Structures are given as C-alpha cells and as structure tokens.
From Swiss-Prot:
Residues 1-11 have a biased composition (Basic and acidic residues). SMART domains: UDG, UreE_C. It comes from Equine herpesvirus 1 (strain Ab4p) (EHV-1). The active site is at D155. Residues 1-61 are annotated as: Disordered. This is Uracil-DNA glycosylase. One of its GO terms (cellular component) is host cell nucleus. PROSITE patterns: U_DNA_GLYCOSYLASE (PS00130). The gene is 61.
Length: 312
C-alpha cells in the first residue's frame, strides 16, 4: 500500500548528509541519528505541528429544533377514545345499558383505551369481523343478573358473514359451521328429542341466560387468531371475574385448552365443566360431551329453571 509520502514530488525527497559535532562547530557529545529520505510537510501558519483536537459530537438538539410528540396520546385515533365517557362507548359499540355495572370501570382502564385504539387502526388497514356494532352483541340478550351458563369460545369466525358477536353462533341463512354441528350432536345425544336446527343462530340460548362469549372479540378476515394480542382476553377475563363475584351458581362450559387456561372460576361457588374443543380437528369426539345435561341437572338442583336447548 502506498503511503502519503509516495505521492509527493521528487523535490520533496532530500538527502541530508551525516555530520559530526566538529563539522557543526559544536562540542556536544550527543549522537545524532541518521535521517533518511523524509516527507517534509511544513505546518500552516499559526500551527505548532501538533494534531488538531478531536471534534466532539454535539449533544441535544440544534437551537430552534423541536421534536414532534408521536406518543399514543396525540394520535388522532387515540384522542377520542381517551376522552370518551361511558355513554360515548356504549353508543359507539351498541352495548346494552344493563351491562354498565360490569363494564364501565373496566372500559375506562388505560389498557382498554389502547385496545380500542389499536382496533381502530386495524380497521383502517384490514377487514375486521364482526362489525363494530356487534362486538358486544353478547350483552344484548340477557342482563348480567340473568346469566346462568357461560360458554367460552376462542375468537370469532373469520369468514365473511359469519361472526355476529355470539360465540359459536352464525346468523340465519349462513351455513352452520362444523364446530356448531358437533355442538348440536352433543345436545342430541343428551336429549334424543332434540332436532338439528336448519340454522346456527343461537339467539334462543342467549335469551335464556347463556352467555356465549369469545376470549378475543375481533378477528381479521381469513386470519384466525390475528387479534389475539390486542388485549380483548384481558377485558373478557375481567367481565367473567366480575360475574363470578356478583353471581352464585354459574355453570361454565370450557371447551379446549384455550378456554380452560383463560378462565378459572371458583369451583366452590360455580360448576366448572371442561371438555375438548368442538372443532372437527379436535382429538376428542365432542358428540360425547355431556355438559348440556350436567348443566341442567345443576340448575335444577340449585332451584333454577333448566335451559331449553332446542332451537327453532
């Protein structure tokens, strides 16, 4: 590799003859070293030849420069949610007023505000099910004090036209999903007189106090589990915990590992039934699930009316 001196002109290379003290007219006995060809660089006027001091990186912002705050609180989609009253949220999401004692305090928590804002951001970039007005449809069929049975699902159906806010349910005119067909088969095994409905709308169950709720309340089209990290599970868990403390003798049907991990009612105060998931992909034959019979036996034993599982 070439050095800087290699690029100097030949005039820059001089031979300095070795001299002795006598030749210099000096009596000094200090030996001199031999100086070979050198690259002679004259310092600039005012310089001493020492290396220049290192430039330090400036700290802070230049004068007159200010950063724009991009935190959550200043995002236009966040501002509305953070300032919304319960009435605003109730109206926007079509929540039944009877659920205010269960939901109001939780809906004002910071994590719910972030959750709803993230939901709005997702809606701006992808198709989300169910429609916003149906996310809390599970509140509109029975007030909290009338809930007797809680069936916990995972997340909504992800195909167009299926999800409408009730776990495992689809509206009339929509083909009955395989999981719901297996649920119907389990009911029929416990109640031979049960007739398989031609539709999958579970409204009649919900009106009798069967809470059909998913742990995740929204999903992106064609992407099951895509909204599992938004925070819905925390809100649903709070709702279930609140129901457990305000009611006695609830029946919980927890199907599959996900439901069983996300919900842990006090077994001393409530009946907790567990089984495999009704999905056809489950290793367990859901047709043998006895929960519908066991739930009614428990309700009757505790002096309450059993659920009529027949759907017209």
């Amino acid at each position: 590799m070439s050095s800087a001196c290699d690029h100097e002109t030949e005039a820059s290379h001089v031979n300095i003859p070795e001299t002795t003290p006598e030749e210099n007219g000096s009596n000094s006995s200090t030996p001199t070293s031999e100086i070979g060809p050198a690259c002679v660089v004259s310092p600039a006027p005012g310089e001493t030849g020492a290396p220049p001091p290192k430039r330090r990186r400036p700290c802070g912002l230049p004068q007159g420069v200010a950063l724009i705050n991009t935190s959550v609180s200043t995002h236009p989609l966040f501002t509305t949610s953070c300032q919304s009253s319960w009435e605003d949220v109730e109206r926007e999401f079509n929540i039944a007023p009877s659920w205010r004692p269960i939901l109001e305090r939780e809906m004002q928590q910071p994590y719910v505000r972030l959750l709803l804002n993230e939901y709005k951001l997702r809606c701006a970039s992808e198709e989300v099910f169910p429609p916003k007005e149906d996310i809390f449809a599970w509140t509109r069929f029975s007030p909290p004090e009338k809930v007797r049975v809680v069936i916990v699902g995972q997340d909504p159906y992800h195909a167009p036209g299926q999800a409408h806010g009730l776990a495992f349910s689809v509206r009339k005119g929509v083909p009955v999903p395989p999981s719901l067909r297996n649920i119907y088969s389990a009911v029929q095994k416990s109640y031979p007189s049960f007739r398989h409905p031609m539709h999958g709308f579970l409204e009649r169950w919900a009106e009798q106090g069967v809470l059909l709720i998913n742990t995740t309340l929204t999903v992106a089209r064609g992407k099951p589990g895509s909204h599992a990290t938004l925070g819905w599970h925390r809100l649903v868990r709070a709702v279930i915990d609140r129901l457990c403390t305000t009611s006695q003798g609830l029946v919980f049907m927890l199907w599959g590992a996900h439901a069983q991990k996300s919900c842990s009612p006090n077994r001393q105060h409530h009946l907790v039934l567990t089984y495999g998931h009704p999905s056809p992909l489950s290793r367990v034959n859901f047709r043998d699930c006895p929960h519908f019979l066991e739930a009614n036996a428990y309700l009757t034993k505790t002096g309450r009316k059993p659920v009529d599982w027949q759907i017209e």
